[in-house]
Amino acid sequence: MEIRRALPADAGPLAALLARFFAEEGFAASAAEIRERADVFLAEAANTAFLAFEDGTPAGAATVTTGFGFETGRQAEIEDLYVLPGRRRRGVARGLIDAALAWCRQRGCADVEVVVTPEGDARHNLGAWYRGLGFDETGRRILSRRL
């Protein structure tokens, strides 16, 4: 398995993986919207993505955004983590998380957050999986407003 940081030329494969992820999880963004956003995402210095390859074929992806706040300074969020169903339980997700965390450390992030939806937790036991990687529940809730 090879894991590397996505380049602008990887926007297509990244978008294809994320489109599958969004469709599986029932997220609203269409494949066309995801493809368009991949170019923008990869052009932003505060963002990055990692791709995992098995035998030269994309097997998974992770996306990371960073910001800066008064409470913790530089911080990051792992926005998306997806591994193709046939490639799961082989360490691909763990490798992507390790690469993302290393990048966050290099950028000087004080902490890294991940949002686990109730559906994702019920389907994939994500809360326990992330806790096993050292993530803790903060007790904070995320409220969102569409603009």
Predicted regions and their residues:
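Acetyl-CoA-dependent GNAT
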Residues: 5-73, 79, 97-98, 103, ...
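Conserved acetyl-CoA-binding loop of GNAT-fold acetyltransferases
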Residues: 109, 130-140
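Mid-chain, well-packed structural core segment of small domains
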Residues: 78-85
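Conserved beta-strand-loop-alpha-helix junction that forms the acyl-donor binding cleft
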Residues: 113-126, 147
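Extreme N-terminal starter segment of soluble prokaryotic enzymes
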Residues: 1-2
